[in-house]
Structure formats: structure tokens, C-alpha cells
């Protein structure tokens, strides 16, 4: 189980090879009987583990011995001391205990000690005789052990009920148990500890021998798990006992009832295991020739296995009697199946089938939801595991299964609020599966859903976006969203804030890019909404995506502690705002978050999201008619010429040589699925048009300015490309349209410009893609008119002495106040040297601007000035070398301070040189 | 000249009937190192062949080039003309300005390299020192050869004929007052050259600075060396061996000065152009003014 989660979560980096290694290590010992399989180092690691365990257990047994001695001489003080030491030692041995289960001898000493203390407590006579120290120690020890034993209650009760329960299963326990039955006998006790130790040290061989005896081909691993299960059964039964609290009789009765099936069932389990193992072997067959012989030995059994599959199906009938026991079997089986995970030969498809069968069995037997949930978790995990390669994606049928499975799982979880699911539930002890009153199952629904989302993205990435298939896959998106929504609801009830944040983010990621047409419609027709039919009303009832985003994001802003989730949430929120033309909210959020400052430190997917957001913001600004903002937002993305790459919408061919295969894979995984793409042509068009609206008037205003800078390099590039064309036909592409429009605008010909920007072709290519196309077009026409007017004035103001505003308003089809305001603005900004003559409604030019020739002459003069200065320096140099001859005369026309200083310096130098 | 062709890179051959510089024999186009030159030579050969074909007595006396606002003083022209003049001493280059001609006055000029420049070019040493020694400045790079155009009588008759037939409007191109464009262009070009000149000077300046710095270093090094040697002498040790100073201090590469000479020449041409142009235009403006006053 835990193995899955590690592979599941860090799957990004883990290669299949290392994954395998990870799996083989703990399992290595399982093949103790198959020496061919067992490599040297595996044995070594095993030994290391054993010795650590031995050491701890030795410590424990030593302490137990002293306690028993103290008990014998009624030295309670000593008992107390030793008990405390024992508690500490047990704490140290915790890790081993977690692995191996609570050692029986430890339980026994706890039980015995408690009994003994109770005995002493009861014994009034003895107590009176006791010295003061002892009496005090007695009471404290009694309290302590009561408290302490509460943790081990289940173990102790089971031990008390049936001290010899597993006697015939395990030699160690056998030893211990027999010891337990004669617990008064102190001498034997000491010996038993020793034997225990001895047993431990020779454990592998002894065990295997034992099991050889017991059943021919039982694996050690199955034995181990069996072991665990047995402990488990004990605990489950005792738990149910303690729940009932009726009395021991019933429990004992049930115990006895169970007893029979136990052995019976054991055989069953063995058979099942055999079958399973044979199956595994069968898979492995091709791989290892050595194994062939062994295989041959078991050939007969292998045959039986094939028949054994129905046996699995039949099994339920046998289990019908005792539910608890079936839990154990099912879980044991589950563990078995899981052990095979990640191994090379394992048939993953078969594994999934097996697990599904198991679920069926569990369901048919009403094994309780806990088991089903657990198995479901594993099925989903195996489904994810099905593809060993990260690059490949799930097959459609697998994907469907996965979705169904998750849905079923959610059904169960919703139906049974008493099931607790969590990643961390079972970390201490693997064997506590489903026993407590509130069912506790290890597994994280959130991780599963996140993984599901990843798989979905992968599927979308790997499907041709222009095929019908893609559309089919896209239909699953609704399902994915539904699942996420359900998980969200579930986690809102049960999850921690972090989990809620994560699921919220997932929800946000599935919401932010979708345009909310319903809300949009509602906005457009607010009054009619009320008069609409009932059905429409219901349709409209669904939460506005804006409200939803607001709610989810706010929660994340408030609760999230990881920076990444918050960053993503903010970006998505901005994107969503921008998509719905809420420019000011989007902009404010962007500015407040200060993301622009530190986004370069984020990881690439977040950067891609940031780029997408910026682009969306720019497009939003454009729709609002804020050309400058639009241009600024899009500048970074567009100026690099790598918009495609920056938005994660495709790889550039150019850089193909620069990256190796590995990098390419990584980059490929970063790609945004097609349905999230932002139309690049639209993007470029928006950028170019806004650049045109800014640049053309600017160019006209600074026609003759030497230090003119360009606002948009890319726009200029396009213009130059257009100029270079030997033959100019009517524009075809979007860029050509914009270039042609720019040329028309340069002449102040807004009508031509308009016809180039807005026509059939451009509508189809760009403008119709906006949700409010007509509004955008109207805005655009107006912008073109205004900017054309400005350009016209810049370009031709030198021709006019005065110009009537009415004429201008006729020319540009703008109303008089607008013309007035534009011209006033230009005058105020000192862009236009003119004044308005109010009574006649004319603009009177001042003619203070120099003409083109004058400008040129001025520039020439400036250049000549610098030329002269440079020339002087040459001369100065000469003069320096020839020794300060002209120094005094030259100062006259030296105005530059720095220059003079340098000259002086040189003179000094030359003087020292001579 | 009886016939002329437009376009850069074509060759002019003067038929024997043409006056002007008479040559002794045919010249080769020189070593053509650029593609343009190759075309030039091909064109030349073609022309020669054609002339021989129609059995015309001809001499190869140079080549011609059309120009744009008088920007012809370039390295390419210098190289070409040098190779021509090297092969055929009497070669000239004809510069034809179609724009100016379109404005009403035929602009056709013949140039030759001065003997001084020929010397320099032969040496192929354009370092500042060499140029200084040759005592060459931009004024003395090219010498203009006066042009006399002589047509056959038949052509003269034709010309007269045509002049009578031509419309009046064609003649008044000469009096056009719309001159700003031409002037602007000239200014623009002049400005570009000034920029280039400026850069060139900066380059030269850096070179000078580097040289002087190095001189100083060299000097210091020598002094230090001397001091050390003195000390060594006083201690009775043998003096340090002499090292090759030129190896230690590699003098910086002096920039070629020919380009700046050419630019200066070009600037000069522009200035003359502008001067000429403005003089003409001023005259025209005064005339226009007088005309207006008279009309009023």
C-alpha cells in the first residue's frame, strides 16, 4: 500500500527500474526457499534487519526477566523501575514492532504484571505487611500499567482469552504460549526467553523448514502475511468483544466457532496462494530458465490453478459463516496481489482483474465497506500502474474503468460517513485495517483524484486535437469535473485544510478557462431572466463560475500555506476575471499579488500558467479598448517570438537540436491540452492591432526625430517585411491585413484602414472568436477613427494654416465633441502646436514646428558638432604628444568639462614623459 | 556622346567617332574579384563582340556608372577605376545622375584618379603614414575631365526635330519650385556620411590613444629595466639580457585611412551638390517672387 503511494506521488522522476528495486528488497526474503532467486545482497539486508530486531528483543526479554524476578520476591519498587525501563525499550523497538507486530512475550508480561498487581492490591493482608516504599510503588505502578495497557488492550484480551491460540502455527509463539500457560514458573520463563532468542537467530532456516513441513510450497511471504493476519484476527475479534462488553462467554463461543474455520480457511488460503503464485510464476517463466525446473515440479499444481480461478469465485460460499475471518483472507489475498506489483513479470492486467474479483467477493459477502474501499483503492492504484512508462497514456477502457471505480468509491464513502480515509492512518501498523468502530482505511482519495486528473491531461495531450477521438475524450471532462466536485464535497466535510486547498485548486484548474456562457447570457438580459420559463430558471440556478471561483480562491488565499497552490489559484482567478472581461478586478489582482516580480523563480508549469494569464489579461484589455494595457501585457510574450512555447502550446522546431530526448519528453509533458489553448493568431492580431494603434500616431508625431524609439519591435518587423515585398497584392494573411491597414492609417485614411482590419476574412480569423464580437468591432472602429485623426493631424498639420473641426469630424465620422476633445488633448500634451478658435470651431496652427528641411538641417548641425569634437580630440592627441603647444588657445572653444580634464591629464602625462 | 546606357556596372566603349580621351588599345577589366565585376566583364566582352560583329572601329576607354543623388565616391568605384586606369592609362569613369538629369540638366561627368592616388593604390598601403607621405587629401583624389559632347549631324538634326515636337510642359521641369524633396534627400545622405565620418574618427582616436598608451608603457618598461640594470651593475651582477621590445609591445593595427578619405570625398560631392542646387533654387525663388510681384 505504502509502496503505491510512493510510486504514485513521485512518479515523475522514478524510472521503472528503480521502482522495481524498491519492491524487490522487502520481498526478497520471500524467496528464501527459492535459492535461485535469492541474491547475495538481499540475504545481507535481511540479516541486518534480523539482528536489529534481535537486539531490541533481547533487551526487552532481559528486562522482562528482571521484572519476573522482582515479581517473585514481591519487590514492587524494583518492578516499577524495571517497568519504566521496559516502556522505554519498547519505544526504541517501536520501528521493529511496527514491522513485526507486537511481540507476544511483551503482551504476556503486560498481562501478567497487571494480574499480579491486581492480586497484590486485592491482598489486603499482604498490603499491610508491605513496607511504605513498596506500597507506594504498587499504587503508582498499578495506575501506570492500567494506562499503558489501554493501548494494548486488544492484544491483551486476546491473549488472555486464548493464550494458546496460534500455538500450532508459529513455533515462537508456540514457545511463548506454552510459557504463558505456565507463567508462574519462573525458571522456565528465563529459559524461554533464551529459547526465544535462539529461535529468532536461526529464524529463516527454521521457519522455512517448518513451513516446508506444513505445506510444500508455501512462501515465506505468505507465511508472514498470514502471521499478520492472525494477529489481526485476534485483534478484530477482541475488539468486537470489547465493543459488546457482554461477557467473555459469547466471545469465547465465537472464538471457538471461528476456530474451526481458521484451519479450514488456512488451507483455502494456501490453495489460493498457490494458485496465485503459480500464476506469478507463469508470468515469470519466460524470464528465468532456472526456474523452469521448479516449475516442472509444480506443473501439476499449475494445472490445478487454472481450475482454481472458479474456485476463487466459489469461495464466498465457504466464507458465508464467519465474516471477520473473511476480512482477514481477503486482506491477505490483497496483500499477496499487491506484493506482485512492480515486479517485472507481473501481468498487470491480470492483477487488476484479480482485484476486481476480490471486490466482487467482498461485496457478495457483505464484508463491510472498509474492505471494499481498501480494495478499490488498490484497483485504482493498479490502473494507474498499468502503464509503466510515464510518457504513455491510459487506454480508453482503462480510463473508463478508472473513472467508474473512483465513482463507486465515492459512492461508498458518501454512503458510509463512518469510514475514515487517510494517507497517514496506517503508517504505524499495517495490520490494523478495518477493525475499529469507525472504519479506518489507508489511502488518499485526493491523491487518486489528482493522479486521475494527471492521467486525463496526459490523454488529452496525446490525442490528436483535430480528431473525433479528442472530442470523445473531451466528453469525459464533465465526468472528471463531477468526480472532483464530489471529492471536494467529501473533503469539505472530512479533509484537512491542506487537502481542501488541494482539491479546490483542482476544481479551479478545471473551471478557470471555461467561459461561463450562462452567466454571460444572464448578464446580457437581466430583466428577461425573471420572466423566463421554469426550466431556464433551473438551468440558471447553477452557481455562477465567477462566484465559485471567488469562493474557492478566497479560501485558498486564506488557508493555504504552500506558496504554489496560492500562486496557481491567483493566476487562475485573474485568468477567469480576464476571460469574463472584468478587467479592473483582474488587473488589480495581478498588481496586488506582485507576481510579476518573482514569477521567474516559479517552476515551469506555473510560469506557463502565468504567461497564459498575462495573455488573457492583454486580450481582455483589448476588448475593453485599452490598447496600451493590452500592448504592455502582450509585449513580453510576443516580442520573444516564442509565444507558442511560452504558452505551452507546442514545441518549437528550431530548438530541437538544442535539447536532448529527455528534455523534450519533459517539455512535452508540460504542454497544455488543446482545449485550453489560446488562439495564437488571435493573440498576435490583438497585439499587432494594438501596436498599430499606438505606433502609427507615434511615428507620425516623431517622423523627423532622430532619437525616435520604436514602441513595438515586432510591429516594425512586420512593416519592414511588408515593405520588402516586391509586389504587393491584396492582403491574405492576418499580418498582411494589419500591415496594409497600418499603411492606410499612416495616411490618415481611416476608411481603408477599417476595411483592412474588419472584413470577412479577419472576422473569420479573429474577431468572431471573441464572445462579444460586435462590441469589440465597434470599439475597434472608433479607435481607428480616433487614432487616424491624430495621425492625420500629426502628418499634415504643417500643410494647414487652420482647419475646421467640422471638416475633421466629417472626415473621420466622429462627432464634434470627440474631435474637440482629441485635439484639445493633443494641444495640452504639446503634441500639436495649435490653438482652438472657439467661435469658428477651427484649429489654428501656430507653425512653430520646424519643417522637414529645418529639422534635417538641425540634425545635421548636431552631427557636425559631434564630428568636430571628435576631430578635435584627434588634434588634441597630436598636440598632447607634441607637448602642450596649443593649450592656451584651445581652452577657448572647449566647453566640455570632462573633455578638458582629460586634455589636462594628457598634458601632464606628456610633460612627465619629456 | 552618341549613345549611352543607363545602369550601374555596364561598360562604356567609345567608338572612334566620339571625341574625348582617345585610347591606344583595348583594356581588360582587371582582376574581377566580385560577382558584380564578373558581370561587368561579361557585359564588356559581350559589348566588344557585338561591336566587332557590326564591324565598328572601337576603343575601350573606360566605363560608366549611374548614381543616386551623387553618391558615387565609393571603394568599389575606386578599385574598378584603379584597375582600368592601371591597364589603360587613359581610362575614365563616366558618372551619370538620372535624377538630376530628369530635373532638367544633363548630369554627366568624367573622372580619373589622380597620379598621386594611383601611386598609393599601387602600393596598396592605406596606413596613415603612407597617406601622409603621399600628401594626399580628398580634394586630390579624383580629377574631373571636361566633357565635350559631339553628335553626328544627323543626330543634331533629329534633336532639333524632336525639340520642336515636344510639348511645352516637358521643358518647364527646369523651373519647378518643388525642391524640398531633393534637398531633404541630399541632407539625409550627407548626414549618414557625417555619421560614418564621425565613427571613423572615433576609431582613429582610439587607435591614437592606444598607441600613446603603449608608448608610455614601453617607456616605463625601459626605464625600469635601466634602473634594474644599474642596480645589478652596482652589485656586480651581469646585466639583464636585452629583450625584443616589439614582441612585448605589439603596436596596435592602424586603421585604414582610405575609407575616411573616400567619405570625405563623398561629403565634398554632396556639399557641392547642395550648393549648386540651392544656388539654382534661390535663383528660381527670386524669379518666382519677382514674377508674383509683377503679376500683382
Swiss-Prot record, chain A:
Residues 166-190, 217-232, 291-300 have a biased composition (Acidic residues). The modification Phosphoserine is found at residues 9, 11, 13, 15-16, 18, 39, 166, 178, 181-182, 910. Keywords: Acetylation, Cytoplasm, Initiation factor, Phosphoprotein, Protein biosynthesis. It is found in: Cytoplasm. Residues 199-216, 261-278, 887-900 have a biased composition (Basic and acidic residues). The modification Phosphothreonine is found at residue 525. Phosphorylated. Phosphorylation is enhanced upon serum stimulation. Residues 1-44, 157-302, 523-543, 886-914 are annotated as: Disordered. Component of the eukaryotic translation initiation factor 3 (eIF-3) complex, which is required for several steps in the initiation of protein synthesis. The eIF-3 complex associates with the 40S ribosome and facilitates the recruitment of eIF-1, eIF-1A, eIF-2:GTP:methionyl-tRNAi and eIF-5 to form the 43S pre-initiation complex (43S PIC). The eIF-3 complex stimulates mRNA recruitment to the 43S PIC and scanning of the mRNA for AUG recognition. This is Eukaryotic translation initiation factor 3 subunit C-like protein. It comes from Homo sapiens (Human). The gene is EIF3CL.
